[in-house]
Swiss-Prot record:
Keywords: Ribonucleoprotein, Ribosomal protein
Organism of derivation: Mycobacterium marinum (strain ATCC BAA-535 / M)
Protein name: Large ribosomal subunit protein uL13
Family (UniProt): Belongs to the universal ribosomal protein uL13 family.
Pfam families: Ribosomal_L13 (PF00572)
Domain of life: Bacteria
Length: 147
């Protein structure tokens, strides 16, 4: 009997909602990346996008240590000479907490052609509300040790 090879149309995609309140950023990113890639499914294949949709809410309440809020830097470059900008994660969390969480999750995904397709299934919101109630997302609980 030949080995089963999943195809892109064979998978049924679910919607998961993750509440980021008091969850460590790295643990949240790993859990979301695994759901996005479909590593929790028995039909996982690294060359097929068989993952689920993930909604992250309360991104502004994610747990980041004070040391990292002050000292960890986020870099961006405009492409022009001398165009390097660096900001602390604390500054970014004040203005755009959803971007900080999204960047952490995307950083956990593979760097290949499939990555953009996987990233399109991620939705991050700073507050508790999201516009995806019609998809009936299932709450996903991240098991972690108390801080």
């Amino acid at each position: 009997m030949p080995t089963y090879a999943p195809k892109a149309g064979d998978t049924t995609r679910s919607w998961y909602v993750i509440d980021a309140t008091d969850v460590v950023l790295g643990r949240l990113a790993v859990a979301a990346a695994n759901l996005l890639r479909g590593k929790h499914k028995p039909t996982f294949a690294p060359n097929v996008d068989g993952g689920d949709f993930v909604i992250v809410i309360n991104a502004d309440k994610v747990a980041i240590s004070n040391e990292k809020l002050r000292n960890k830097m986020a870099y961006s470059h405009s492409g022009y000479p001398g165009g390097l900008r660096k900001r602390s994660i604390g500054e970014l969390m004040e203005k755009h907490p959803d971007r900080v969480v999204e960047k952490a999750i995307v950083g956990m995904l593979p760097k290949n052609k499939l990555s953009r397709q996987i990233q399109s299934k991620l939705r991050v919101y700073a507050g508790p509300e999201h516009p995806h109630t019609a998809q009936q997302p299932v709450p996903f609980e991240i098991k972690q040790v108390a801080q």
